Amino acid sequence: MAVVGVGVDVVDVDRFAATLSRTPGIAMRLFTPAERGLARPERLAARFAAKEAVAKVLGAPPGLEWHDAEVVLATGGRPSLRIRGTVAAAAQRLDIASWHLSLTHDGGVAIAMVVAES
């Protein structure tokens, strides 16, 4: 396997929470129903950072749908990516075979790092 791309994103949790509260419907546009179930702002901010990091790995092609990159929990609670639709198509064009995801939130910021391999 070879590294195809690395994406990192940082989100200010308070600013993100304020955006969610003042913009009706934004959570519906950004997150899957399962992701929205994690109502704590720092968890949603980390998942948004992950989606942004995925877009960076893919070169931010136009037309990516936020719901097509979903953060799920793998065995043992480790975060993992489930991709479909527009994200899966962009990943296929880059011959991406596997994804690695790390999330953290502390001190008012949420950070995601994504590594894609062929």
Swiss-Prot record:
Disulfide bonds: none annotated. GO terms for molecular function: holo-[acyl-carrier-protein] synthase activity; magnesium ion binding. Its cofactor is Mg(2+). GO terms for biological process: fatty acid biosynthetic process. It holds the Pfam family ACPS. Keywords: Cytoplasm, Fatty acid biosynthesis, Fatty acid metabolism, Lipid biosynthesis, Lipid metabolism, Magnesium, Metal-binding, Transferase. The keyword Thylakoid does not apply. It is found in: Cytoplasm. It comes from the Bacteria. It is an enzyme of class 2 (transferase). One of its GO terms (cellular component) is cytoplasm. Belongs to the P-Pant transferase superfamily. AcpS family. This is Holo-[acyl-carrier-protein] synthase. It comes from Frankia alni (strain DSM 45986 / CECT 9034 / ACN14a).
